[in-house]
Amino acid sequence: MLIRGLDMADIFDEVSEELKQDKLIQTWKKYSKIIITLILLIIISLVSYQSYLIWKKNKIEEISEQYFEALEKLENKNYSKSQSLFLKNAQNHKNGYKMLSLFGLAESNYQNGKIDEMIMNYKAIYDDESIGIYYRDLSRILSVLKDNLSSFDQQKLLLQPILNSPSKLQILAAELEILLFIKFKKIKEAEKALNILLDRSDISFEQKNRLELINRIYKNNVF
């Protein structure tokens, strides 16, 4: 009886296993197309993503090469060529190289004597809120520093957002403001701004030396 019981148990196990297999086969037949489609979609997605990463890497390398080629032309004083390359990079890309290319484009135009174009290049940087505030402030300072066309009010207005904020470049902007006063022969304003800046405890040793030198020069000649 024990043997028969074991045989019956084995038979039930076999039948149960066969039923499971039949059910699995039926399920596979019913859903195989959907399952295969899902697997293919996953594979296609993975391949597409990897292809995108490879494309992106190659694109970044291409952009990088274009930027450094433009930079080399700028360093070699081939300003027309550097202007063309920087302009292409600035127009076609939206990553960090666009911002760097705008700085390079501004410098190329400045060296070519195209001050109006230079001003617009820097404006494109400081008007773009997606760019970090440090670089936007830096573009304002460089624009004022190199601008020999705009009025005093226009240049002073450009510096004002830096002067009124806790920017890392605030002290440098304050120093540039003094030079702006002197440039436009606003001597009393220059002297007042110079004394205020010299009294600040957060100016660097190098900047203090520069300011004291300016103070001595203009005190002996103008102030």
What are the language-model segments listed below?
Residues A9-S16, E72, K98, D127-D128:
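Acidic, proline/glycine-rich low-complexity intrinsically disordered segments
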Residues Y67-L100:
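Short extracytoplasmic
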Residues L2-I43:
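N-terminal positive-inside, membrane-proximal cytosolic segments immediately preceding the first
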Residues K57-S64, S80-Q83, D153, L172:
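Amphipathic alpha-helical repeat elements characteristic of tetratricopeptide repeat
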Residues G96, L102-F103, Y110-F223:
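Soluble extracytoplasmic domains of inner/organellar membrane proteins
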Residues I44-F68:
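Transmembrane signal-anchor/signal-peptide helices with a preference for the extracytoplasmic
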Residues I54-W55, A90-H93, D127-S130:
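Flexible helix-coil transition and linker loops at the boundaries of alpha-helical arrays
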